[in-house]
A protein has these predicted regions:
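Conserved alpha/beta cores of soluble small-molecule-handling proteins
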Residues: 2-183, 187-188, 216, 221, ...
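Glycine- and Gly-Pro-enriched alpha-helical subdomains that act as flexible
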Residues: 183, 190-212, 217
């Protein structure tokens, strides 16, 4: 109950202004609402710090450049806004931040960026979200869905865009089948990723994850790979099949922290 009260009373940062949750809105003409034209980052807060913030902001700016979206401010200014928002909400731990940037407000509901009449809309939503301590005991159940991750020349899955229909289709299929998460394949039938988390397996002492061609190169994903390399643990970004998943010793994903997967 206390957690719900705290969530309902948060202040949300919209373009630098702190607004109570129940009053926080964006225009119906906003590019993100009309078209899903925007980018985002998911950030964790530990002991008052935002781990790997520089990498998150670098990826955000790279996504903006790919979309020809002018951020309209510096990384230092946006970083200051993030910490201002945390301070205003008295948040220091067990917090997840959704940082969203859209192209801005349009004069009419049309996809051409030329009809955008404002600067970008930048929203910071901080929420208390502690990892579920029971997840590793029971594990998450995966369902292999028929929706595939797509080619980069259709919609590059390595851009963290607001256009998430591909993952939403996978999520719906898994949920309707009674499972927790979707395991998604690439166009060639190799394992790509899950609908909302990355996917690793361990086989014969080796850590495997997908090639990365059909998924976001997540910050935590890259950190896991780097930690394995630093500790002489064999780790491979490679193509592998469902058959190899079924024969794995361990399945794991990263959803608010490391989570073991119980069934695939």
């Amino acid at each position: 109950m206390l957690r719900l009260v705290r969530l309902l009373s948060i202040l949300i940062n919209i373009n630098g202004e702190l607004i109570p949750r129940e009053q926080a809105t964006v225009s119906v003409f906003d590019s993100g609402f009309i078209l899903g034209d925007g980018i985002w980052e998911g950030l964790r807060v530990h002991d008052g710090a935002i781990p790997f913030l520089d990498r998150h902001l670098k990826r955000l700016w790279e996504g903006a450049k790919a979309l020809d979206l002018d951020m309209g401010l510096s990384q230092e200014t946006l970083s200051a806004r993030l910490f201002q928002t945390l301070k205003a909400n008295q948040m220091t731990d067990h917090v997840h931040i959704r940082l969203m940037v859209t192209r801005g407000i349009k004069s009419t509901p049309y996809q051409d960026p030329a009809v955008t009449i404002s600067g970008p809309t930048i929203v910071i939503i901080p929420e208390f979200k502690a990892p579920d301590p029971t997840l590793n005991d029971r594990g998450l159940r995966l369902y292999t869905v028929y929706t595939r991750r797509g080619y980069a020349d259709v919609q590059d899955p390595r851009i963290n865009s607001h256009s998430k229909l591909n993952c939403i289709f996978g999520c719906i299929q898994a949920a309707k089948a009674g499972y927790d998460e979707a395991l998604m394949l690439d166009p060639h039938g190799h394992v790509a990723t899950c609908n909302s988390t990355h996917f690793f397996i361990v086989r014969d002492g080796e850590v495997w994850t997908s090639s990365g061609d059909y998924c976001l190169d997540g910050i935590t994903r890259r950190n896991v790979i780097n930690v394995c390399k630093a500790n002489d643990i064999p780790v491979f970004e490679k193509n592998f099949s469902l058959m190899q998943v079924y024969g794995a010793d361990i399945l794991s994903g990263w959803l608010l922290g490391s989570v073991l997967l119980s069934q695939s």
